[in-house]
Amino acid sequence: MGAQLTKGEATVEGKAVADKANGQENGHVKTNGDVSTKPDGEAVAADGNGTAEVAKDEAPKTEEGDGIEAAPATEAEASKSDGEAAKETKKKKKFSLKNSFKFKGISLKKNKKASEEAAEAVATPTTAEDKPEENGQAATETKEEEPAAETNETPAPEAEAEPKVEEAEPKAEEPAQQTETAPTEETTKSEESPAPVEETTPTESSDPEPAAE
């Protein structure tokens, strides 16, 4: 029984040393290393002879020695692998940072657009408030222009009627002028006609005087 216990302990220690020799990183066992010690130990245990116990006792020692000697190498490999893993993670981080920056840039652009839209939305109510005033002013202006246009349109017929009235007035004035000119001509004629009569009368008066002599 004691031999069996030692066998179990030896196999457990051998597995642990083999695992250390293979190298454990962050709880993940790497299987890249050669696992030569385990089959030898298992083969010795499978023989079941008395010499196997001695071989088992020697095998753990050699395994422990190999493990001690391999430990620095595994530590160096582990450090290298850690460095490589760190580099990979850094690269991944760099890529992720770039991607995140890109996404952040896009999100910032979107946020900027959203903020601009929000600012415009905030500004639009004020402009909308201003616009109703402008629209109100424009409406009042249009209303003012419409009556002005109506007044301009309505005087147009009146203006058209006024020239007709003016034309009628000159026509009425023309007959008046004609009537005025006609009496003046008659008066001039009447004034001219008595003049010869007056001239004839002296001749008649002059004639009888010599006749009387």
Curated annotation (Swiss-Prot):
Disruption phenotype: Morpholino knockdown of the protein results in reduced head and eye size and a ventrally curved body. No significant effect on formation of craniofacial cartilage. Formation of ceratohyal cartilage is disrupted with an abnormal angle relative to wild-type. Morphogenesis of the developing neural tube is abnormal, with a smaller angle between the walls of the hindbrain neuroepithelium at 24 hours post-fertilization (hpf). Retinal development is significantly delayed; no retinal ganglion cells (RGCs) are detected at 30 hours hpf and reduced numbers are found at 60 hpf. GO terms for cellular component: cytoplasm; cytoskeleton; plasma membrane. It is found in: Cytoplasm, Cytoskeleton; Cell membrane. A lipid is attached at G2 (N-myristoyl glycine). InterPro entries: MARCKS. Residues 54-64, 77-88, 161-174 have a biased composition (Basic and acidic residues). Expressed at low levels in brain, eye and muscle. It is a lipid-anchor. It comes from the Eukaryota. Residues 149-158, 175-185, 193-205 have a biased composition (Low complexity). One of its GO terms (biological process) is blood vessel lumenization. Keywords: Cell membrane, Cytoplasm, Cytoskeleton, Lipoprotein, Membrane, Myristate. Residues 1-213 are annotated as: Disordered. Residues 90-113 are annotated as: Effector domain involved in lipid-binding. PROSITE patterns: MARCKS_1. GO terms for molecular function: actin filament binding; calmodulin binding. PANTHER family: MARCKS-RELATED PROTEIN (PTHR14353:SF8), MYRISTOYLATED ALANINE-RICH C-KINASE SUBSTRATE MARCKS (PTHR14353). Involved in the control of cell movement by regulating actin cytoskeleton homeostasis and filopodium and lamellipodium formation. Belongs to the MARCKS family. This is MARCKS-related protein 1-A. It comes from Danio rerio. The lineage of its organism: Eukaryota, Metazoa, Chordata, Craniata, Vertebrata.
